[in-house]
Amino acid sequence: MSKNAYAQSGVDVEAGYEVVERIKKHVARTERAGVMGGLGGFGGMFDLSKTGVKEPVLISGTDGVGTKLMLAIKYDKHDTIGQDCVAMCVNDIIAAGAEPLYFLDYVATGKNEPAKLEQVIAGVAEGCVQSGVALIGGETAEMPGMYGEDDYDLAGFAVGVAEKSQIIDGSKVAEGDVLLGLASSGIHSNGYSLVRRVFADYTGEEVLPELEGQKLKDVLLEPTRIYVKAALPLIKEELVNGIAHITGGGFIENVPRMFSDDLAAEIDESKVPVLPIFKALEKYGEIKHEEMFEIFNMGIGLMFAVKPENVERVKELLDEPVYEIGRIVKKDGASVVIK
Protein backbone atom coordinates (compact mmCIF):
# COMPACT_ATOMS: atom_id res chain seq x y z
CA MET A 1 0.00 0.00 0.00
CA SER A 2 1.11 3.56 -0.64
CA LYS A 3 2.04 6.02 2.11
CA ASN A 4 -1.30 7.83 1.81
CA ALA A 5 -3.41 4.68 2.01
CA TYR A 6 -5.64 6.17 4.72
CA ALA A 7 -6.37 9.20 2.54
CA GLN A 8 -7.17 6.91 -0.37
CA SER A 9 -9.73 5.17 1.82
CA GLY A 10 -11.47 8.53 2.32
CA VAL A 11 -10.05 9.74 5.64
CA ASP A 12 -8.21 13.08 5.46
CA VAL A 13 -6.06 13.27 8.59
CA GLU A 14 -4.70 16.70 7.67
CA ALA A 15 -8.22 18.09 7.40
CA GLY A 16 -8.87 16.75 10.89
CA TYR A 17 -5.86 18.62 12.22
CA GLU A 18 -7.11 21.77 10.52
CA VAL A 19 -10.50 21.44 12.21
CA VAL A 20 -8.80 21.30 15.61
CA GLU A 21 -6.82 24.45 14.88
CA ARG A 22 -9.87 26.28 13.58
CA ILE A 23 -12.03 25.55 16.62
CA LYS A 24 -9.51 26.49 19.32
CA LYS A 25 -10.58 30.14 19.38
CA HIS A 26 -14.22 29.13 19.72
CA VAL A 27 -13.52 26.70 22.54
CA ALA A 28 -11.54 29.41 24.36
CA ARG A 29 -14.72 31.52 24.59
CA THR A 30 -16.29 28.91 26.87
CA GLU A 31 -13.65 28.94 29.63
CA ARG A 32 -15.04 28.97 33.17
CA ALA A 33 -13.83 28.38 36.72
CA GLY A 34 -13.16 24.71 37.35
CA VAL A 35 -11.75 23.76 33.96
CA MET A 36 -8.44 21.92 34.19
CA GLY A 37 -6.16 21.21 31.25
CA GLY A 38 -6.60 22.25 27.66
CA LEU A 39 -7.93 21.00 24.35
CA GLY A 40 -6.38 17.82 23.00
CA GLY A 41 -6.02 15.63 26.08
CA PHE A 42 -7.46 12.15 26.33
CA GLY A 43 -10.10 13.39 28.75
CA GLY A 44 -11.58 16.71 29.83
CA MET A 45 -11.11 17.61 33.49
CA PHE A 46 -13.20 19.76 35.82
CA ASP A 47 -12.56 20.66 39.47
CA LEU A 48 -15.94 20.31 41.18
CA SER A 49 -14.73 22.10 44.31
CA LYS A 50 -14.70 25.37 42.35
CA THR A 51 -18.50 25.35 42.23
CA GLY A 52 -18.85 25.95 45.96
CA VAL A 53 -21.66 23.40 46.20
CA LYS A 54 -21.77 21.83 49.67
CA GLU A 55 -23.54 18.55 48.86
CA PRO A 56 -22.95 18.17 45.12
CA VAL A 57 -25.03 15.84 42.98
CA LEU A 58 -23.94 15.50 39.36
CA ILE A 59 -26.74 15.50 36.79
CA SER A 60 -26.06 14.60 33.17
CA GLY A 61 -27.91 14.70 29.88
CA THR A 62 -27.28 13.76 26.28
CA ASP A 63 -29.16 14.58 23.09
CA GLY A 64 -28.90 15.47 19.44
CA VAL A 65 -30.92 17.65 17.10
CA GLY A 66 -32.68 14.99 15.05
CA THR A 67 -33.54 15.61 11.43
CA LYS A 68 -33.30 19.37 11.83
CA LEU A 69 -29.76 18.63 10.67
CA MET A 70 -31.14 17.68 7.28
CA LEU A 71 -32.50 21.20 6.87
CA ALA A 72 -29.18 22.72 7.93
CA ILE A 73 -27.54 20.61 5.21
CA LYS A 74 -30.26 21.41 2.66
CA TYR A 75 -29.99 25.16 3.23
CA ASP A 76 -26.20 25.03 3.75
CA LYS A 77 -26.47 26.89 7.06
CA HIS A 78 -24.42 25.34 9.83
CA ASP A 79 -23.66 28.14 12.30
CA THR A 80 -26.63 27.67 14.66
CA ILE A 81 -27.23 23.91 14.70
CA GLY A 82 -24.58 23.55 17.40
CA GLN A 83 -26.57 25.87 19.66
CA ASP A 84 -29.53 23.55 19.19
CA CYS A 85 -27.45 20.63 20.41
CA VAL A 86 -26.28 22.43 23.54
CA ALA A 87 -29.79 23.67 24.28
CA MET A 88 -31.33 20.22 24.10
CA CYS A 89 -28.87 18.94 26.69
CA VAL A 90 -28.63 21.83 29.15
CA ASN A 91 -32.37 22.54 29.16
CA ASP A 92 -32.95 18.94 30.22
CA ILE A 93 -30.58 19.06 33.17
CA ILE A 94 -31.76 22.49 34.32
CA ALA A 95 -35.19 20.86 34.62
CA ALA A 96 -33.68 18.67 37.35
CA GLY A 97 -32.29 21.69 39.19
CA ALA A 98 -28.73 21.46 37.92
CA GLU A 99 -26.38 24.28 37.04
CA PRO A 100 -24.70 23.08 33.82
CA LEU A 101 -20.91 22.95 34.16
CA TYR A 102 -19.38 21.43 31.07
CA PHE A 103 -20.22 20.06 27.66
CA LEU A 104 -18.75 17.63 25.14
CA ASP A 105 -19.75 17.25 21.50
CA TYR A 106 -19.57 14.46 18.95
CA VAL A 107 -19.64 15.11 15.21
CA ALA A 108 -19.61 12.31 12.63
CA THR A 109 -19.32 13.12 8.94
CA GLY A 110 -18.71 11.50 5.59
CA LYS A 111 -16.09 14.05 4.60
CA ASN A 112 -14.11 16.37 6.83
CA GLU A 113 -14.74 19.90 5.56
CA PRO A 114 -12.90 22.19 8.00
CA ALA A 115 -14.77 25.40 7.17
CA LYS A 116 -18.17 23.77 7.61
CA LEU A 117 -17.23 21.94 10.78
CA GLU A 118 -15.82 25.15 12.22
CA GLN A 119 -19.27 26.71 11.77
CA VAL A 120 -20.87 23.78 13.57
CA ILE A 121 -18.48 23.97 16.53
CA ALA A 122 -18.75 27.77 16.63
CA GLY A 123 -22.48 27.23 17.17
CA VAL A 124 -21.74 24.73 19.93
CA ALA A 125 -19.43 27.29 21.57
CA GLU A 126 -22.09 29.99 21.34
CA GLY A 127 -24.55 27.68 23.04
CA CYS A 128 -21.99 26.99 25.75
CA VAL A 129 -21.42 30.71 26.32
CA GLN A 130 -25.17 31.30 26.62
CA SER A 131 -25.36 28.41 29.12
CA GLY A 132 -22.28 29.32 31.14
CA VAL A 133 -20.73 25.91 30.45
CA ALA A 134 -17.22 24.98 29.37
CA LEU A 135 -16.64 23.01 26.19
CA ILE A 136 -14.03 20.65 27.61
CA GLY A 137 -13.84 18.00 24.92
CA GLY A 138 -15.27 16.46 21.81
CA GLU A 139 -14.78 14.12 18.90
CA THR A 140 -14.92 14.62 15.16
CA ALA A 141 -15.16 11.32 13.30
CA GLU A 142 -14.70 11.12 9.55
CA MET A 143 -16.62 8.03 8.42
CA PRO A 144 -16.67 7.60 4.63
CA GLY A 145 -19.11 4.92 3.59
CA MET A 146 -21.18 5.44 6.72
CA TYR A 147 -22.29 8.96 5.74
CA GLY A 148 -22.53 10.79 2.44
CA GLU A 149 -19.90 13.47 1.79
CA ASP A 150 -22.27 16.32 2.66
CA ASP A 151 -23.85 14.56 5.63
CA TYR A 152 -23.02 14.81 9.30
CA ASP A 153 -24.58 14.00 12.64
CA LEU A 154 -24.20 15.91 15.88
CA ALA A 155 -24.71 14.90 19.50
CA GLY A 156 -23.80 16.43 22.82
CA PHE A 157 -23.32 15.59 26.46
CA ALA A 158 -23.84 18.02 29.36
CA VAL A 159 -22.96 17.60 33.02
CA GLY A 160 -24.23 19.88 35.77
CA VAL A 161 -24.31 20.07 39.54
CA ALA A 162 -27.08 20.61 42.06
CA GLU A 163 -27.20 20.98 45.80
CA LYS A 164 -28.71 17.74 47.05
CA SER A 165 -31.43 19.70 48.84
CA GLN A 166 -32.33 21.64 45.67
CA ILE A 167 -32.80 18.74 43.26
CA ILE A 168 -36.07 19.10 41.36
CA ASP A 169 -37.64 15.67 40.93
CA GLY A 170 -41.37 16.42 40.96
CA SER A 171 -41.93 15.31 44.54
CA LYS A 172 -42.76 18.85 45.70
CA VAL A 173 -45.36 19.62 43.02
CA ALA A 174 -48.79 19.83 44.63
CA GLU A 175 -52.42 20.47 43.80
CA GLY A 176 -52.97 24.20 43.38
CA ASP A 177 -49.51 24.97 42.01
CA VAL A 178 -49.56 27.53 39.21
CA LEU A 179 -48.11 26.64 35.81
CA LEU A 180 -45.92 29.41 34.38
CA GLY A 181 -44.47 29.20 30.89
CA LEU A 182 -41.52 30.84 29.14
CA ALA A 183 -41.72 31.45 25.41
CA SER A 184 -39.93 29.24 22.92
CA SER A 185 -37.93 30.71 20.05
CA GLY A 186 -39.64 28.49 17.50
CA ILE A 187 -39.96 24.79 16.78
CA HIS A 188 -36.73 24.13 18.71
CA SER A 189 -35.34 20.68 17.77
CA ASN A 190 -38.26 18.25 17.78
CA GLY A 191 -40.86 17.16 15.27
CA TYR A 192 -38.68 17.82 12.24
CA SER A 193 -39.51 14.60 10.42
CA LEU A 194 -43.07 15.92 10.24
CA VAL A 195 -41.93 19.48 9.53
CA ARG A 196 -39.83 18.29 6.60
CA ARG A 197 -42.75 16.31 5.20
CA VAL A 198 -45.10 19.29 5.43
CA PHE A 199 -42.63 21.59 3.65
CA ALA A 200 -40.99 19.00 1.39
CA ASP A 201 -41.91 20.86 -1.80
CA TYR A 202 -40.79 24.29 -0.56
CA THR A 203 -37.41 25.85 -1.34
CA GLY A 204 -37.18 27.66 1.99
CA GLU A 205 -37.12 31.08 0.34
CA GLU A 206 -40.88 31.44 0.63
CA VAL A 207 -42.41 34.10 2.85
CA LEU A 208 -45.66 32.51 3.94
CA PRO A 209 -48.48 34.84 5.05
CA GLU A 210 -48.42 33.31 8.54
CA LEU A 211 -44.70 33.97 9.07
CA GLU A 212 -44.88 37.75 9.36
CA GLY A 213 -42.25 38.60 6.75
CA GLN A 214 -39.68 35.93 7.59
CA LYS A 215 -38.37 33.40 5.11
CA LEU A 216 -39.46 29.84 5.79
CA LYS A 217 -35.89 28.51 6.05
CA ASP A 218 -34.97 31.13 8.66
CA VAL A 219 -37.95 30.20 10.81
CA LEU A 220 -37.27 26.47 10.49
CA LEU A 221 -33.63 26.88 11.50
CA GLU A 222 -34.24 29.34 14.34
CA PRO A 223 -32.00 27.99 17.12
CA THR A 224 -33.46 26.42 20.23
CA ARG A 225 -33.71 28.81 23.13
CA ILE A 226 -31.45 28.15 26.12
CA TYR A 227 -33.20 28.67 29.47
CA VAL A 228 -30.29 28.28 31.89
CA LYS A 229 -29.81 31.92 32.87
CA ALA A 230 -33.55 32.43 33.28
CA ALA A 231 -34.11 29.34 35.42
CA LEU A 232 -31.04 29.30 37.68
CA PRO A 233 -32.04 32.23 39.94
CA LEU A 234 -35.42 30.58 40.55
CA ILE A 235 -33.72 27.32 41.47
CA LYS A 236 -31.27 29.03 43.81
CA GLU A 237 -34.13 30.73 45.67
CA GLU A 238 -36.10 27.45 45.70
CA LEU A 239 -39.08 29.15 44.08
CA VAL A 240 -40.14 26.34 41.74
CA ASN A 241 -41.50 22.90 42.61
CA GLY A 242 -41.22 21.44 39.13
CA ILE A 243 -39.76 22.22 35.71
CA ALA A 244 -40.70 20.70 32.35
CA HIS A 245 -38.65 21.14 29.18
CA ILE A 246 -41.17 20.90 26.34
CA THR A 247 -39.43 18.74 23.74
CA GLY A 248 -40.48 15.73 21.66
CA GLY A 249 -44.02 14.75 22.61
CA GLY A 250 -45.07 18.34 23.25
CA PHE A 251 -47.23 19.22 26.25
CA ILE A 252 -48.82 15.79 26.49
CA GLU A 253 -45.61 13.83 26.93
CA ASN A 254 -43.42 16.30 28.83
CA VAL A 255 -45.58 18.18 31.31
CA PRO A 256 -46.45 15.02 33.33
CA ARG A 257 -42.75 14.29 33.77
CA MET A 258 -42.58 16.98 36.46
CA PHE A 259 -45.27 15.65 38.84
CA SER A 260 -46.53 12.43 40.42
CA ASP A 261 -49.08 10.09 38.86
CA ASP A 262 -51.95 11.26 41.07
CA LEU A 263 -51.80 14.80 39.68
CA ALA A 264 -52.66 16.42 36.36
CA ALA A 265 -52.02 19.68 34.54
CA GLU A 266 -55.01 21.76 33.54
CA ILE A 267 -53.97 24.19 30.81
CA ASP A 268 -55.86 27.17 29.42
CA GLU A 269 -55.07 27.11 25.72
CA SER A 270 -56.05 30.76 25.32
CA LYS A 271 -53.06 31.72 27.51
CA VAL A 272 -50.52 29.86 25.34
CA PRO A 273 -48.64 32.27 23.00
CA VAL A 274 -48.87 30.07 19.90
CA LEU A 275 -46.16 31.06 17.41
CA PRO A 276 -46.95 31.70 13.73
CA ILE A 277 -44.93 28.69 12.55
CA PHE A 278 -47.24 26.33 14.45
CA LYS A 279 -50.29 27.87 12.83
CA ALA A 280 -48.60 27.38 9.45
CA LEU A 281 -47.73 23.76 10.21
CA GLU A 282 -51.28 23.00 11.31
CA LYS A 283 -52.69 24.61 8.17
CA TYR A 284 -50.33 23.35 5.47
CA GLY A 285 -49.83 19.94 7.08
CA GLU A 286 -53.55 19.47 7.76
CA ILE A 287 -52.66 18.36 11.28
CA LYS A 288 -55.42 17.95 13.85
CA HIS A 289 -55.32 20.78 16.35
CA GLU A 290 -55.17 18.52 19.40
CA GLU A 291 -52.30 16.56 17.84
CA MET A 292 -50.21 19.73 17.63
CA PHE A 293 -49.95 19.70 21.43
CA GLU A 294 -48.76 16.07 21.26
CA ILE A 295 -45.86 16.96 18.95
CA PHE A 296 -44.70 20.55 19.36
CA ASN A 297 -43.98 23.10 22.10
CA MET A 298 -46.62 25.43 20.60
CA GLY A 299 -44.78 28.52 21.86
CA ILE A 300 -43.87 27.42 25.40
CA GLY A 301 -40.40 25.92 25.74
CA LEU A 302 -40.05 25.68 29.52
CA MET A 303 -42.74 25.36 32.16
CA PHE A 304 -42.59 25.83 35.93
CA ALA A 305 -44.89 24.56 38.66
CA VAL A 306 -44.92 27.26 41.34
CA LYS A 307 -46.72 27.77 44.65
CA PRO A 308 -49.29 30.59 44.30
CA GLU A 309 -47.47 32.69 46.90
CA ASN A 310 -44.24 32.52 44.85
CA VAL A 311 -45.69 33.58 41.50
CA GLU A 312 -45.02 37.30 41.87
CA ARG A 313 -41.41 36.75 42.96
CA VAL A 314 -40.83 34.46 39.98
CA LYS A 315 -42.22 37.07 37.62
CA GLU A 316 -40.05 39.70 39.28
CA LEU A 317 -36.87 37.68 38.69
CA LEU A 318 -37.71 36.85 35.09
CA ASP A 319 -37.03 39.87 32.91
CA GLU A 320 -39.41 38.75 30.16
CA PRO A 321 -43.07 37.91 29.60
CA VAL A 322 -44.23 35.05 31.84
CA TYR A 323 -47.35 33.18 30.78
CA GLU A 324 -49.68 31.91 33.50
CA ILE A 325 -51.14 29.03 31.56
CA GLY A 326 -52.72 26.68 34.07
CA ARG A 327 -52.87 24.84 37.37
CA ILE A 328 -51.96 21.53 38.93
CA VAL A 329 -55.11 19.59 39.87
CA LYS A 330 -56.01 16.16 41.21
CA LYS A 331 -55.92 13.63 38.40
CA ASP A 332 -59.30 12.54 37.07
CA GLY A 333 -58.47 10.94 33.75
CA ALA A 334 -55.77 12.41 31.50
CA SER A 335 -52.48 13.72 32.88
CA VAL A 336 -52.78 16.87 30.77
CA VAL A 337 -56.11 18.55 30.11
CA ILE A 338 -56.08 21.39 27.58
CA LYS A 339 -59.17 23.60 27.66
From Swiss-Prot:
Q: Could you say which protein family the record assigns here?
A: Belongs to the AIR synthase family.
The keyword Cell division belongs to this UniProt entry's keyword annotation: no
Q: Which cysteines are joined by disulfide bonds?
A: none
Q: Name one GO molecular function term.
A: phosphoribosylformylglycinamidine cyclo-ligase activity
EC code(s) of this entry = 6.3.3.1
The pathway that the record names for this protein is:
Purine metabolism; IMP biosynthesis via de novo pathway; 5-amino-1-(5-phospho-D-ribosyl)imidazole from N(2)-formyl-N(1)-(5-phospho-D-ribosyl)glycinamide: step 2/2
- Catalytic activity entry: 2-formamido-N(1)-(5-O-phospho-beta-D-ribosyl)acetamidine + ATP = 5-amino-1-(5-phospho-beta-D-ribosyl)imidazole + ADP + phosphate + H(+)
Q: Which organism is it from?
A: Streptococcus thermophilus (strain ATCC BAA-250 / LMG 18311)
* Lineage of source species: Bacteria, Bacillati, Bacillota, Bacilli, Lactobacillales
Q: GO cellular component terms? A: cytosol
This protein is called what?
Phosphoribosylformylglycinamidine cyclo-ligase
Q: Which gene encodes it?
A: purM
